[in-house]
């Protein structure tokens, strides 16, 4: 397994093995290879959580930039990841589905991000749905773990609670719902179906190509933990 030197999963807890839940190149924005907890908190079972943003063939997250990029919000559908298919990272059973949260305008400007941060407390008080947005929780078949995939597009979830899914089966599409400043996928593994009561579990991804954010030839990774800003692409199983 390849991981950054400061990644310290519990040695008594074997990592949850997953495949990347998307196709094409995505940049790793937050990762436990950089720090644990990766999002600055152990709350909601996200100690070992990942955030990924989709890229185009020029490694851009959005198709354009203009005056709105500098001073205000932007349409979510301007971003490459918006409405990209999100796939099951392993075989399992859908134990929870939440849909109905709107997709927000996206934010890249410092001013719009500051305004958003000032409303963070309000979202937390509104409950889990306001944080995760539209999401799917899977109970994995091959190990005692649950995986949450969050910030999906409003109305995009294609699987009902109770459904059994295979690895690679579409669950929904990437959106900008919940606590999200631009379309991205949040994923983490946990030891309970409800993130409120769960503890986070470490993850390794199997079968992908990785390359530095600044460019360079991709290299194959059999089992690994993507580094921060690393660009990853799933390889066929």
Question: How would you name each of these model-derived features?
Answer:
Residues 1-37, 43-45, 231-237:
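Terminal presequence/propeptide segments associated with secretion/organelle targeting
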Residues 30, 54, 96, 151-154, ...:
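A residue-level detector for short acidic-glycine micro-motifs
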Residues 37-39, 128, 163-166, 188-237:
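Acidic, glycine-rich catalytic/binding loops that coordinate metals and/or anionic ligands
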Residues 47-49, 83, 132-136:
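Short glycine-rich loop/turn motifs
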Residues 58, 100-102, 171-181:
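Short, charged beta-turn/beta-strand-edge "cap" motif at the junction between a beta-strand
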Residues 80-82, 131-132, 157-158:
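Short, small/polar residue-rich loop motifs at catalytic or cofactor-binding pockets
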Residues 86-96, 159-173:
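Short, well-structured beta-strand-loop connectors
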Residues 93-153:
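Zn2+-dependent peptidoglycan hydrolase active-site motif and core
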